Amino acid sequence: MAKESLRIGVASTEPKRVKVYILEDNEWRDTGTGFCTGQCEQDKPHAYLLVRDEEQPERVLLKSKLEGNIEYQRQEETLIVWKDLQGQDIALSFEESTGCNALCEFICLVQKTFENNISLVSVRSNDDGMGSVHEIITGPVHLPSNDPQQNEETLMESLRILNENTSFEFLKNETVDFILNTNYLHTLINHFHIAEEKLLHKDLLLLSHIIKTLFLYNEREVLEQLIDDKHYMGVVGILEYDTDFPDCKASHRKCLQGVRPKFQEVIPLNDENMRQTINKTFRLQFLKDVVLIRFLDDHAFNLITDVMLTYQTTIIRCLQEGSFIDDLVNLYTNNADTSDSDLIERKRQGIRLLDECVQISCNLDPPDRSIFYKVLVKKGLFNVLDFAFNVETNSDIRILATDMIISIIEYDILLINSVRNEVDDSPFAATNEDSNINTGLIDEGGADSADNNCNGNSAVKAGESNGAESPIAPPGSRSPSRHTSDISLLLILSKILLTDQSPGLKEQAFQALITLLDPEDFMGEEYEDQSNLESLMKFYANSKLREKPSTPPQFQLLEYFTKFYEQVAPVLFQSFISGEVEGMDDQLLLRLVKLVDLLIHEHDIMLSRGFILENGILLTIGKLMEPSHIIQLRLAAVRCIKGIVAVNDEFYHNYLISKNLFDPICQLLQENLYFDNMANSCVLDLFKVISARFGQDQEYAEVSTKNFLVLNQYLVERFGPLLEKVDYVPYTSSMIQMSRVGRDAINKQQDNNGERNTTTGGEADNEEFDVMGAMDSSLASESDGENNENNEESPYGGAQNSKRSFSDIEDNTIGVEKGNPEPGLPIKKLAEEISESS
């Protein structure tokens, strides 16, 4: 009776033109052409494939019953082949593939209703023509036992069936439907509790195998059922047992029960769906990183990751659309009381929460990620950072805050500035406190105002050249003393780098500064056009442009770096400006040297050169080559000078010569003259650069000959005896040989161009001409062999005509081998020693 009711839905098919073949003596015999239909008997649950002759419809060419365990094969697109229960091989060749499709659908429908043991298999040839691929379209499916009374035998059979059913998509889909539409997981978990209570160890191991196999099905619906409230703890408990470690048992449930009270709500979460999504995300994370870490294959791992990403996207969208972030930021905006320990702890938890949200957002699609970051900045992220860097002393919390900054600027370095512009242009800009950040670095007098920040370290004082006023302004103020968010961020990071005691936090701040100060991150491919950018610089300087809502990125970049050199650089490089580096941490000095090198190479020379030369930065870098510093710092200083030389700028070259900044470099070479080490290679690499560029300048005499001619001539005249000792590389001897050619070229250029800068110390109308005059006069006096001991201070903070001989540099570290000149000898005596040793 059941079969009768099932048969009602099976309808006959439309006639389709076919050829009927019978296999006789291993040859297919054509028995005729006709029209095939799939039909069911009215009174009995029987189905047939019926073919009638196309010329004589009353003549039946074929009537084959669908019964037993017949396997029908669909070969290619138009052929159905099978062997009936009498052993006769039959084939139907359809005129069109649509006819074949209709009969295949009929076979599938019959199989699902009353002839469950028949099957339909698709057979396709491989692309290489070798062999074939079989795929089950429909057929009998063996499913695991769902009997409430499970035992070792039924569990073993269920495991075998589950593994076999992964081989074909049809069997896999049928098994998935069985799992989802029955209480199979509930049956397994119930038996797990019984087996654990009765110590049925084999049953426990089989249950663990079965659950792991379900994960390998890679079906999202099954995965979500495994982690729902009804099944998750049972599933995790089953996975505590592992056949790889049969004598051991994990403690996943104990871990979860211990973690459960630690889920804290900094701000009450009223959305129950949101709460469930967060719980599911955590459960998947725990499975992926703890429970199944040794078991998951790539497909299962990717499935869990994709589901987690979906949940995380939902979480981030819900957070930014509701009032949750506003309520969270209000903790830092309206509560300045630092004596309330509970409030301080809530603020710390809030930073942990925000950092976790930011790290989660790193996995989102770029549009979703950008929207979330903009929402954070608009709603007051800088108020949170203000607490983290100016109030909080816990280094772990400060590191998390730095992580947030780095994640945002690494994604979009202009995002903070662009959001700041949107806020400034909004009707509420006057009352927005987001850009009014206390960096704790500068007060109105240029001194530090953060006595207790950064773990009690002394802060940095800005020099008088800073000219920056206090970043603290009354709410609603639009005075020039206010720092925009991007400059406030630079000041915060500078403060961390200079004063914090955590090495990890310093390194994070350093990397963030590198990202923020690299113009390529701002401009992308547009930055490649240097000539265009330089013209923009000049136009900007002449017209005093101010940033507008429609300001293109190029002018935003100019405005940004101009503010950096006016407000941040004097603070960041204060120790280099003052020259007071004694007693400072060499690792900090090393990072500062790398930042100077970044400014020289990546920033437009019209901005960076003025700041570096006017503040005597290179003089301090020269001090860092002294033996009292670690070798890494000394070599970094040499590389910085090498980078300046490679820039091929006349101002830089003249400054290096006039301030004798090659003296400490050659002192370092003297210390390591006969050592095959990094110090020796680093200095010689500098000479190699000079020699190579000098050779190029011979070919392009009208372009840039002067700079390297002058530099080569200076080095050979001042350090010739030392260069002659470096006879194990070819380019030092080339420098000496080319100095003769260079001297002739310099004389020729001087004859053509006339005498330049005949006076020294005079005030020029333009500051740059004043600076250059000082350098040229110094160089001129050195060329004449004059050595004035009482010189006036140059505009850079150094002596104008300070010509120190190589012998004046003290050496306090490495001695030299026998035959090496002792440190402290004048050049003339050094030359005598060289001739004696030879």
UniProtKB/Swiss-Prot annotation:
One biological process term in Gene Ontology: meiotic recombination checkpoint signaling
Top-level taxon in the UniProt lineage: Eukaryota
Molecular function in Gene Ontology: protein phosphatase activator activity
InterPro entries attached to this UniProt entry: EVH1_PP4R3, P4R3-like_central_dom, PH-like_dom_sf, PP4R3-like
Subcellular location: Nucleus
Region span, Disordered: 452-482, 745-838
Presence of keyword DNA repair: no
Compositional bias (Acidic residues): 783-792
SUPFAM superfamilies (UniProt xref): PH domain-like (SSF50729)
Keywords annotated in UniProt: Nucleus
Membrane-spanning segments: none
Main location: nucleus
Summary of the function given for this chain in its UniProt record: Core regulatory subunit of the histone H2A phosphatase complex, which dephosphorylates H2AS128ph (gamma-H2A) that has been displaced from sites of DNA lesions in the double-stranded DNA break repair process. Dephosphorylation is necessary for efficient recovery from the DNA damage checkpoint.
Subunit structure: Regulatory subunit 3 (R3) of the histone H2A phosphatase complex (HTP-C) consisting of PPH3, PSY2 and PSY4.
Protein name from the UniProt record: Serine/threonine-protein phosphatase 4 regulatory subunit 3
Organism: Eremothecium gossypii (strain ATCC 10895 / CBS 109.51 / FGSC 9923 / NRRL Y-1056) (Yeast)
